Amino acid sequence: MQAARMAASLGRQLLRLGGGSSRLTALLGQPRPGPARRPYAGGAAQLALDKSDSHPSDALTRKKPAKAESKSFAVGMFKGQLTTDQVFPYPSVLNEEQTQFLKELVEPVSRFFEEVNDPAKNDALEMVEETTWQGLKELGAFGLQVPSELGGVGLCNTQYARLVEIVGMHDLGVGITLGAHQSIGFKGILLFGTKAQKEKYLPKLASGETVAAFCLTEPSSGSDAASIRTSAVPSPCGKYYTLNGSKLWISNGGLADIFTVFAKTPVTDPATGAVKEKITAFVVERGFGGITHGPPEKKMGIKASNTAEVFFDGVRVPSENVLGEVGSGFKVAMHILNNGRFGMAAALAGTMRGIIAKAVDHATNRTQFGEKIHNFGLIQEKLARMVMLQYVTESMAYMVSANMDQGATDFQIEAAISKIFGSEAAWKVTDECIQIMGGMGFMKEPGVERVLRDLRIFRIFEGTNDILRLFVALQGCMDKGKELSGLGSALKNPFGNAGLLLGEAGKQLRRRAGLGSGLSLSGLVHPELSRSGELAVRALEQFATVVEAKLIKHKKGIVNEQFLLQRLADGAIDLYAMVVVLSRASRSLSEGHPTAQHEKMLCDTWCIEAAARIREGMAALQSDPWQQELYRNFKSISKALVERGGVVTSNPLGF
């Protein structure tokens, strides 16, 4: 019973996590489309200006219109729908001036990381070297998405992704320092801040004069963010809150001057008068007093970044430093994290690009058995798989960033997928690079072992991949569940809902019979990719059939079916990856890019294997008795390990 209650609680939090409910759909609004006011104004930067005169609660409290049909491909695929608005054609969002401005930034940033920054030295020092730190300030790297009017560079999400990719290619430790500062550290001020908060904090944060940190995780609160214990008690006069508690593993924790802190506060329900504890976000200055930090943590990787525990002891926080609405901190935190995940995928695409270059260089120059090793099939397959993973990750990153720049508000599943896929792909690519390089890859000098150490954390922070898989599956199933509920209601009045019933029921029956639902990507994918397009449609139908069957079987109880949800998420990730590369490769073929035929091969190869994985995975889920036995075995084996305190079986020798 306890496990069931825990699972149900986790499920409710996961469904809140991404904004699938109407409460979160309009939470903070993504950048609104419209003419650019500056050649490099857009995305979060322009949004910060657009909302400067608004009360921070506007996005949380304004009257929400009836929810429109989602344009998210990921939401649609759970329903067996081809929702292509956000994926075809592959989006191109930068105007000529924005493109030119970005090009002018790429060259100096690349040169800086090639000639000035020393990732090995940063790793050895376990800090960002002072020369690099000052150089980053001069480049404006601490305020890439802060509007120029507030001292930043004013980049949109797509421009930001391109520069983050360069950082990820060279030094993930520096990348974490910068990302913890602006991707999550002060992102809440950028998105939720009042005009006064923005004007007070953003200029110094953008220049690097002050550093920001995001304080959510606690010793007893990791993936379960709602269980935080840090408290903020309002004063009787209402002018300030007294903050007490601690936050664990905070990136920039020992460096930061400004903290985005999440704490429990008493909130009175206006309807009932009952007082409940809810999470509230605060902007907290180290200068308020009562803030200390522990020593830098000794870590496996990203050693150049500062990670420390932060303590708050009787910190007086002015009431005007509430970020967003009192009691809306969980939404603020989740929106900040959702908003920044595309940047992680972009950075890791850059990491893979650099690692693949090292692997190719070694394979091209290393001779064994009288042959360059790049001529051997085993090496060829490794290199091909490595570059496919990079291509998919990069395609996802720029797809999501472009969707955000175009004003999409429903991208949470796609952003989560990009984080899951990118972090796992980068690990695989780097591991294979070491394998190709052999003993040399294991040595410190080439720097690949450092990258592998740095990469391990990416599957853990900003939402563990395990939790995000549950989120992807549950969020998608929630939307499909609403549709099934609608069909159930329609059946009570069949004559008044004949069109709906005939359309949806017909598609469902055709899918179940294996006849196909008439969906097609014809006219969207390039003719040379038509076979791969057909594979994607077939995979979508297979996936949607299983989603529907499992929802009908488990109903709301599906939140407890983590074995199933994980496998549905894997299918969703593969399916989204197929569509993204189909879109990107189609654009390259249509525009006659020099690499178009190479991209076609990457796309076709990916789709062939992904379709096979989806087909096999969904077939296994449909073999219900076998799957249930498998799940029971997992539970029993795990229970035995827990009861024994480790491995149950004895050594084969008996002692």
Curated annotation (Swiss-Prot):
Effect after changing R469W: In ACADVLD; likely pathogenic
Main location: mitochondrion
S-nitrosocysteine: residues bearing it: C237
Chain positions with Phosphoserine modification: S517, S522
Residues annotated as the enzyme's active site: E462
Binding site for substrate: F461, E462, G463
Recorded consequence of changing S583W: In ACADVLD; Loss of homodimerization; loss of localization to mitochondrial inner membrane
Modified sites of kind N6-acetyllysine: K51, K71, K239, K276, K278, K298, K331, K482, K550, K556
Annotated segments matching region Disordered: 23-42
Start and end residues of each stretch annotated as Membrane-anchoring: 483-516
Protein name: Very long-chain specific acyl-CoA dehydrogenase, mitochondrial
Species name: Homo sapiens
